[in-house]
């Protein structure tokens, strides 16, 4: 099964009792040794925009496991390809309240896509809270499988 959006967000952002802003911490831009796959100098001719001064060595997606795991031992949560999750896309609440284990929209035409990919370089796109939506596949979107704990 695909993870829910809440499961994906926990796996990407949870670091003890803290929620990370970016895979590397709270400061921007990423350090040179961040080792996540974003729109860097090597992909400039493909993406048209890059994260200046950053090079991860991959023009587009990298093989899984090319970069070290995050604090929860999960690979590629902050870059490489963005990921489909199970939830139907709905616009977040305007009051800014944090939802606890939200179930997402009950119906709709678009599904949630979480995380940054090799084609992203803007500060908002690199945040672990970044979310997108879509119906059709893209060359910078993939998926991961989740299973129920026994």
PLM segments and residue spans:
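Functional-site microenvironments in short loops/helix caps that host divalent-cation chemistry
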Residues: 1-128, 135
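Short, structured beta-strand segments at or near domain termini in extracellular proteins/domains
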Residues: 139-150
């Amino acid at each position: 099964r695909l993870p829910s959006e809440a499961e994906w967000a926990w796996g990407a952002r949870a670091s003890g009792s803290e929620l990370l802003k970016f895979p590397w911490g709270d400061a921007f831009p990423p350090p040179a040794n961040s080792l996540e796959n974003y729109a860097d100098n090597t992909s400039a001719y493909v993406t048209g925009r890059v994260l200046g001064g950053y090079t991860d060595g991959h023009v587009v997606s990298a093989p899984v496991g090319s970069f070290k795991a995050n604090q929860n031992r999960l690979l590629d949560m902050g870059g490489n390809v963005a990921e489909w999750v199970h939830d139907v896309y709905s616009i977040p609440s305007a009051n800014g309240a944090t939802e606890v284990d939200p179930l997402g929209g009950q119906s709709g035409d678009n599904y949630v896509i979480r995380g940054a990919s090799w084609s992203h370089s803007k500060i908002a796109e690199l945040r672990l809270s970044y979310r997108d939506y879509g119906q059709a596949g893209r060359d910078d979107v993939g998926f991961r499988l989740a299973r129920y704990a026994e």
